A protein has these predicted regions:
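Alpha/beta-hydrolase active-site loop
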Residues: 174-197
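C-terminal catalytic histidine-bearing segment of alpha/beta-hydrolase fold enzymes
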Residues: 294-387
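Glycine-rich nucleophile elbow surrounding the catalytic serine of serine-hydrolase chemistry
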Residues: 207-217
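Alpha/beta-hydrolase fold nucleophile elbow
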Residues: 198-209
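Short, surface-exposed "cap/lid" segments of acyl-processing enzymes
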Residues: 80-156
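The feature captures the conserved acid-bearing segment of alpha/beta-hydrolase catalytic domains
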Residues: 239-304
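Cap/lid segment of the alpha/beta-hydrolase catalytic domain
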Residues: 131-134, 160-181
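Active-site nucleophile loop of the alpha/beta-hydrolase fold
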Residues: 230-239
Length: 387
């Protein structure tokens, strides 16, 4: 993996020189001051943008100069390709030198990995079966990304960063190559660059769906990760490829099990809805079982998502990540998750009643969501808990 980095930001102050040994306190203070200033700058300099789905479907291209003129960007050369990676930093809930990094799920439908083209929505057999086309084929408002970073920051009471994945959220590249070794290498290089820019000590990681696949690879390959939370992550599908092209080689989470199992510095946690239609539990739970066989027990929290596909567990992932960052026990996190499950079940039941009333009055005909079923009380599979 070849990586070169040019860190560009129109306004963010850069730290100069090295801090001498023994000056860790001063270094941390400087880093926190830089974070606070950076968070102020993002509120004033980074206006909301709408990233069009048509552009993302084609693949996002940019120049080094345009990247440098855009707030919160990194110009990286990874595996022989230039990328402009964008991120959104928040200190809404607090500041720290080990931020939470969030990686979102996949967008834009299904990829034909034989041709490496998008499957047209009319021909995509997964549409309306494993995903809602209206939810994935849509523009992205960068305000929403900042709000997500805010939510993680408030829950974990520290700095949080929404790191835009390849080809979406403001990062350049083609999202066709999501969950590949190229994307893993790109996100890893972005963490190195962010760490250098802000003087961070390390990171906590959180992912949703496809983002969790990348989280797993980062947790296995880095020594500076404390918490790693997989939300609805497809962690059991084994990919074989004879390609030597990192852009066409899918990440294989199973290969990471030995590294994670033996890395006692990382606390790995899973969040799963047993009724998930997008990434079934059978493609999540065996990862925890394989980890157990490798000598490492990890918590897996079973939850009830409120969307029709039982797949979006970001709210739960925020809660679990916050608990991990704040060093709560597995039991304490399980209690908090159980309370959230009950609250979401009450919300779903109320929504079902409102929809039924509207339908009865002839105002709406939408059927109640399947997530009004009884909640599973946030049950966990821990086999001894996390580390």
């Amino acid at each position: 993996m070849a990586v070169s980095t040019h860190i560009s930001h129109a306004t963010l102050p850069r730290r100069r020189g090295r801090v001498a040994s023994g000056a860790c306190g001063a270094a941390s203070t400087i880093a926190l001051q830089a974070i606070a200033l950076a968070a102020t700058l993002v509120a004033t300099a980074a206006c909301a943008e709408i990233i069009k789905k048509e552009d993302m479907l084609r693949g996002i291209t940019t120049t080094r100069d345009r990247c440098a003129a855009t707030a919160w960007t990194l110009w990286l050369n990874v595996d022989g390709e230039d990328f402009c990676v964008r991120y959104y930093l928040s200190t809404a809930g607090g500041e720290g030198t080990r931020p939470v990094i969030f990686l979102t799920g996949d967008h834009l439908g299904t990829v034909n990995t034989k041709t490496w083209q998008w499957i047209p929505i009319g021909e995509d057999r997964n549409a309306n079966v494993t995903f809602d086309p209206a939810a994935t084929y849509r523009d992205i408002n960068t305000d929403d990304l900042i709000k997500t970073a805010d939510a993680f920051s408030k829950m974990a009471k520290t700095t949080a960063i929404y790191l835009a994945r390849i080809g979406i959220g403001g990062s350049s590249g083609n999202h066709l190559f999501r969950s590949t070794l190229l994307e893993l290498h790109l996100m890893n290089a972005a963490l190195d660059a962010i760490k250098q820019r802000h003087g961070f000590e390390g990171f906590h990681l959180a992912g949703q769906s496809g983002g969790s696949t990348i989280v797993t690879g980062l947790a296995a390959g880095r020594s500076d990760i404390a918490c790693a939370v997989s939300g609805s992550g497809r962690l059991m599908r084994s990919y074989y490829s004879s390609s030597t092209d990192s852009a066409r080689t899918r990440v294989n989470p199973l290969e990471f099990i030995p590294s994670i199992a033996h890395n006692q510095s990382v606390r790995f946690i899973m969040v799963t809805d047993s009724a998930d239609r997008s990434v079934p539990a059978k493609e999540q739970t065996p990862f925890a079982e394989r980890m157990h066989q490798a000598g490492r027990d990890i918590p897996q929290y079973f939850v009830t998502a409120t969307d029709d596909y039982h797949h979006n567990v970001v709210g739960y992932t925020e809660l679990v990540t916050g608990g991990c960052v704040l060093r709560k026990s597995d039991a304490d996190i399980a209690t908090a998750v159980g309370n959230m499950v009950k609250g979401n079940a009450a919300y779903s039941e109320q929504r079902r009643k409102e929809i039924a009333l509207l339908a009865q009055n002839g105002i709406a005909s939408r059927q109640p969501s399947s997530d009004s079923r009884p909640a599973p009380e946030g049950r966990t599979r821990t086999r001894g808990g996390g580390t």
